[in-house]
């Protein structure tokens, strides 16, 4: 998309404003700040259940959550102070509780064609522990849904992407052309928006593009020339599990400049933060490589992903629990309790 509408990703406050205009019920309670004034009282107003978001891009690491990264109100005030010191603006939002999912849509400025929904895992370590990352891995089901989502939930998210694309045009006069990525959360109070991105999700793109049946170039051309309505966009009925291997110490103090050994001819392998030096693959410090497993059964797809990862070596680690029965069952159980 063009810069005017890509602001949906680069400015958290602009994104919330757009959502307010077209589907305000999808926004959490929130307030914008550029100074420390009023921060403590608003956090108290939210009952100490809050999220602080830097109003800009920080590689998926500018969000701090109470009870996870921020242990108390003083921790929240201290992080707000950090942002103010570098001249930044930030949002404080109510903390939403539920299960996150990603829905990406192809958009030609008028028509949206939706991709299968995917669930990302931001935390660095097994069991959803450790610091936030750009995303350690993702999974999608063969029915293009997720086990804790209803058809109604998915339709709601699709409608939200459509309304947001339309509102962006109305607000800026610039049609949104490209991939629109909605980050959603299913809560006890329904589907809410966490954030928007003006691009493919990483790792989510590897899940959906791995099962895309239609010609990708044709889809891109149809977005640009406004003919997406007549373009076939279809996906194989397969489950996918994508897992990243990352340097030890990632994301805070990643090791760098070590050799990575892998089968570069493996079609399920996607190299990322590496460089070729003297015919050797060298890790650069961010997420190193991803492997995608595909099958009609998500747990078999997970085993395929693990098999691919077993062929990669270096000073690396990955999350073994993504796409496993234990983790997926815990997500279903948690959502059932929230929806009681």
Locate predicted features.
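Internal nucleotide-binding/catalytic subdomain
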Residues: 47, 63-203
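Catalytic-core regions of core metabolic enzymes
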Residues: 4-6, 39, 256
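Active-site "cap" helix and flanking loop/linker of ATP-utilizing ligase/carboxylase catalytic domains
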Residues: 155-181, 197-266, 276-277
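Peripheral (often C-terminal) accessory segments that flank ATP-dependent C-N-forming ligase machineries
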Residues: 222-340
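A short, GP-enriched loop/loop-strand-helix hinge that lies immediately N-terminal to
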Residues: 1-11, 23-34
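Short, conserved charged micro-motifs
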Residues: 38-39, 71-75, 149, 153, ...
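Structural element of the ATP-grasp superfamily
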Residues: 19-20
């Amino acid at each position: 998309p063009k810069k005017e509408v890509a602001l949906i990703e680069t400015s958290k406050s602009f994104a919330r404003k757009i959502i307010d205009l077209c589907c305000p019920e999808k926004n959490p309670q929130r307030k914008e700040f550029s100074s420390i004034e009023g921060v403590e009282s608003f956090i108290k107003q939210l009952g100490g259940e809050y999220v602080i978001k830097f109003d800009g891009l920080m590689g998926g690491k500018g969000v701090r959550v109470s009870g996870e990264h921020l242990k108390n109100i003083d921790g929240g005030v201290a992080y707000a102070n950090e942002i103010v010191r570098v001249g930044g603006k930030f949002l404080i939002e109510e903390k939403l509780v539920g299960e996150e999912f990603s829905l990406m849509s192809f958009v030609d400025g008028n028509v949206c064609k939706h991709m299968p929904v995917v669930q990302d895992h931001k935390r660095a370590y097994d069991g959803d522990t450790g610091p936030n990352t750009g995303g350690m891995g993702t999974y999608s089901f063969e029915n293009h849904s997720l086990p804790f989502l209803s058809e109604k939930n998915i339709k709601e998210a699709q409608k939200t992407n459509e309304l947001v694309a339309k509102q962006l045009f109305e607000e800026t006069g610039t049609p949104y052309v490209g991939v629109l990525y909605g980050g959603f959360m299913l809560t006890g109070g329904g589907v809410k928006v966490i954030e928007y991105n003006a691009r493919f999700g990483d790792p989510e793109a590897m899940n959906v593009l791995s099962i895309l049946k239609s010609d990708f170039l044709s889809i891109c051309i149809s977005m640009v020339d406004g003919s997406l309505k007549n373009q076939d966009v279809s996906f194989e009925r397969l489950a996918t599990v994508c897992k990243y291997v990352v340097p030890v110490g990632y994301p805070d103090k990643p090791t760098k400049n070590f050799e990575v050994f892998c089968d570069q001819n493996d079609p399920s392998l996607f190299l990322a933060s590496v460089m070729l030096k003297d015919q050797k693959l060298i890790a650069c410090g961010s997420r190193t490589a991803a492997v995608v497993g595909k099958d009609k059964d998500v747990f078999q797809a997970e085993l395929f992903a693990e098999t691919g990862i077993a062929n990669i070596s270096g000073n690396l680690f990955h999350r073994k629990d993504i796409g496993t029965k234990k983790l997926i069952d815990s997500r279903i159980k948690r959502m059932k309790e929230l929806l009681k």
